[in-house]
């Protein structure tokens, strides 16, 4: 290794404490004198006999070194050799210090932190992978459960979403497979069955967990695949048949592969249920129990169950499928996070495709002309959305620090009033007069919701926090309510009439502020227009205001999905409505069957006496007029959504066909199997019923 200049060692000490600095300097001085003395050993035997011990004071050593250099100057060659020796000694000392304080010098770990990576049985290669992601220490749930899992215990872990539950099972499972109890039984042959199965309620969660297993598992040559509905079945099947170590997936697709015989659990060592309470909420009870029940020898399988809450089904699940000696780790307890009482919390159903049209209208109706912060989950969506909203700026991780400061200064000063930001980029914002917060989707982490919504309603002010959600993922709204204590006020997207009225009010105020000096210039044209229009002055002025704010006509907007040019209708039949199939059958009595393809989002009312659904606005009159010719049927346009059911009473949550979600599942269970007239398995229409099965 080439020698480094002595100065190269100095930066290593910049961040050291004063005491450590002194100790290091003293040690360097001692080594330096010792090396110098050794070189003169042959010529100065008497001096060698009197050579100071390593415990001598630094001042005596400095005097001795000074005397040596002044009284007996060395030749040039000897001096060069001496400098080389000094360099070598100091560099060696630097390398020693590097080894000793490696984790702090590089800014990685703090050994004083009990949760530092070095304090756990994590292999060096995996530690390096974690450091590459900026992870220096384990989160509480990870630290608390690591040894329990690695030592082979079944586990029930309770922690809020977003607290690091994924790595709480990823890390110890990987270590166990490669360096722990399962090392000897590890297989690498073609077609091998999986050793790890992880179940999650949604494809988004499954993909996130799969990403972690794939990234960290690659360190040990472990392979992982992700299986979920709505994607290519064949490619997932081939991945399993080739042989895989870890399978991550949603219950429905995993069940398919199990029943087909593609997936077997003969070599299974771990099974993990993450977000177990959400699996209950989404109707996966039967699927989960069937999958867990396929393990023949449970004594050879370690089961890990993670959940934010422990409802009765989760308790029964743990008693039935986990060993009696299971461990429980609860980081939630009875605590309940609190959102600001000065904030009005609103939840608004909105399909992803409608966001760009709906968000500007939310701003117009709820911001009161003040500042708005819009939170997105990705920097790409932040950039895209800011490009669609006039007068807005994006703030995310790709924005340079200098530009970030310019953007924040402009937002604070009011140069622009809408900031579109990712959660990470918005940390540290301290702006008291933000009137409106919009979250484009429910965050996985309830703390993130409270943190974001708390950006408004500060310093004694009141504010509004609007959270958008896709109707089929309404369970995420319930989760945040449950974990945070927030009670959402459920609203529909601002209707074009609401937005137009708001814009008209602003335009009227602007007109009132126009100087009277312009009246003579426009009076003649105004009189001509009034005389020729045949309208009253008020009506004519109303049209002028509409034109001024860009409204030449008023469009319709769905109350159910926020989609433009769609209208929400309410159907009632004078008797109970149990399923979407019944609604479609009723509509078929007075509407052509081909028109029913345009019916979207059928949802049963909370009292079970009717159902709401969307149709193209141009067809509204056809439905209303048609219902008048059908006995005991009424169809009307709704101005405000009535209370709605979470899911159909049939209990199905993933019904078949193009309407494959909880609203359209047939009777007979959680996945739309065998329902009357609208059953079918996850978009394939399997299951009994009439002609609507395959079509819808």
From Swiss-Prot:
This is DEAD-box ATP-dependent RNA helicase 7. Residues 1-116, 641-696 are annotated as: Disordered. SMART domains: DEXDc (SM00487), HELICc (SM00490). Residues 652-690 have a biased composition (Gly residues). It comes from Oryza sativa subsp. japonica (Rice). Residues 16-97 form a coiled coil. Residues 146-328 form the Helicase ATP-binding domain. Signal peptide: none annotated. Belongs to the DEAD box helicase family. DDX21/DDX50 subfamily. GO terms for biological process: RNA metabolic process. The keyword Coiled coil applies. Gene3D superfamilies: 3.30.70.2280, P-loop containing nucleotide triphosphate hydrolases. It catalyses: ATP + H2O = ADP + phosphate + H(+). Its EC number is 3.6.4.13.
